[in-house]
UniProtKB/Swiss-Prot annotation:
UniProt keyword Cell inner membrane, yes or no: yes
Keyword Membrane: yes
Annotated signal peptide: none
Cytoplasmic side: 29-45, 90-118, 176-196
Keywords assigned by UniProt, alphabetized: Cell inner membrane, Cell membrane, Membrane, Transmembrane, Transmembrane helix
Pfam family, one: MarC
Protein name, per record: UPF0056 inner membrane protein MarC
GO cellular component labels: plasma membrane
Chief localization: membrane
Protein's cellular compartments: Cell inner membrane
Gene coding for it: marC
């Protein structure tokens, strides 16, 4: 049972900086300004469902994609590390706010014409929460844990859905409490937390690259 708790804790530590629900909160507040309370709650719930579904598909279909295209684990680690480090760097030194992204601008224009337009999948679920970095991390981590032997097989079966469900529930809670969160920490607080998470992502991405290079050296030495 301790192995299960350890796996869940490790998964949340790895995924939450990438998912970064607080950034999604800021985006949600910018896009849902004209929605009533019931519609906001519905969008919050649907965004969480979409995030859970995207993560599950990435985890279970990732190995199939790797086998189909002949992608090695070291190659995936290096590519995933580059993506994660790049996303972290952009969070450390943002060139644009979350609500100024192309996806958010496109959805804002759609909302101007149709105030009840769906914002749950794009941009809240993807790319804001379960974006390329999150998907790359999930696929890479799936390959690592399956071949690493660090956790028992039953933990590897049970832990991922629980981790993804926990991330989805955290996102849902943040979106439902978006107004209170914004009043509590403010835009400056969200920006500071995002930069801290960005630094962690840069470190994680660099470590992924190092691990991939070391594995290549070990394989071909």
């Amino acid at each position: 049972m301790m192995d299960l708790f350890k796996a869940i804790g490790l998964g949340l530590v790895v995924l939450l900086p990438l998912a970064n629900p607080l950034t999604t909160v800021a985006l949600f507040l910018g896009l849902a300004g004209n929605m009533n309370s019931a519609e906001r709650n519905r969008q919050s719930y649907m965004a969480s469902v979409y995030v859970f579904a995207i993560m599950m598909v990435a985890y279970y279909a990732g190995q199939l994609v790797m086998n189909t295209f002949g992608i090695s684990i070291p190659g995936l680690r290096i590519a995933g590390g580059l993506i994660v480090a790049f996303i972290g760097f952009r969070m450390l030194f943002p060139q644009q706010k979350a609500h100024e992204s192309p996806e958010a601008k496109s959805k804002s224009e759609e909302l101007a014409d149709e105030p009840t337009a769906n914002i749950a999948f794009v941009p809240l679920a993807m790319p804001s929460t379960a974006g390329p970095g999150t998907i790359a991390m999930i696929i890479s981590s799936a390959s690592t844990v399956r071949h690493g032997g660090e956790f028992p097989d039953w933990v590897i079966m049970v832990a991922p859905p629980i981790i993804f469900l926990a991330v989805a529930v955290i996102l849902w809670g943040c979106l439902r409490s978006s107004g209170a969160i914004m009043r509590l920490v403010g835009k400056g607080g969200i920006e500071a937390i995002s930069r801290l998470m960005g630094f962690l992502l840069v470190c994680m991405g660099v470590q992924f690259i190092i691990n991939g290079v070391l594995e290549i050296i070990k394989t071909y030495h």
